[in-house]
Amino acid sequence: MASFGVRGMGQPLGIRICCCRVCTCINFGFVLSRIGLLKLMQLGLAMLCEGLLIRYGVPYADSIGQALTSFLATTGHCFTTTGILLLCYAFSDKSYSLIRQSLFETLFNGLASCMYFSSSSYMGFACVVWLHPQFLVRPGFWAYPAMTACYYMGYAAGILHALDAYLAFRHFRGAR
C-alpha cells in the first residue's frame, strides 16, 4: 500500500511503494497542508464557475451582458495564477518560502477577493434583472439557475481568497 510522505526531519518526499520512493519531486506535505487545501479549493471553485459560465452563460451572452465578461475574466485570472502558485509550491519548498513571504501573495489574493465580490455582485444583478424573467416564461431555461450557482460560488471564492490574503499577510509580517 502506498503511503504519502510529508516533509519532516529526515523523511524524504514522494510516495513510498514497498522499498522505494517515487515522485520525490512532489511535496505532498504542502498539498495536504492548510494552505495547499485552501489553494485546491480556490482552484476547484474557479474551475466550476468557469465551466458553468462557458456551458450555460456564453449562449445567453446578449442577455447577461458585461457581467458574463467580468466573471469570465475574474475566474480565468484567478484560476491561472492560483494554479501556477500551487504548482510552484508543490514542486519547490524554496518557492513557497520566497513567494509566500513576499507582498505578491497578499496583493494577489486581496485583489482576487475584490474581483470575485465585484463580479459576483454584478452577475447577481444580471440574474435578477435579465435572466429571472426569462426563467419564469421559458421552460428549460437553465442559464438562470447556472448563473445563480455561479455567483454564489463566486462569493465563496471571494471569501477563500480573502482568508488566503489574511494568512499571507500574517506570513509576510513574520507570524508563521
UniProtKB/Swiss-Prot annotation:
Changing A46V: In sing-22; myoblast fusion is abolished and consequently multinucleated myofibers fail to form during embryonic muscle development. It comes from Drosophila melanogaster. It is a multi-pass membrane protein. The lineage of its organism: Eukaryota, Metazoa, Ecdysozoa, Arthropoda, Hexapoda. This is Protein singles bar. InterPro entries: Marvel. It is found in: Membrane. Pfam families: MARVEL. Residues 30-173 form the MARVEL domain. Keywords: Membrane, Myogenesis, Transmembrane, Transmembrane helix. Its main location: membrane. Induction: By Mef2 during myoblast fusion in developing muscles of embryos and pupae. The chain crosses the membrane at residues 13-35, 71-91, 111-131, 140-160.
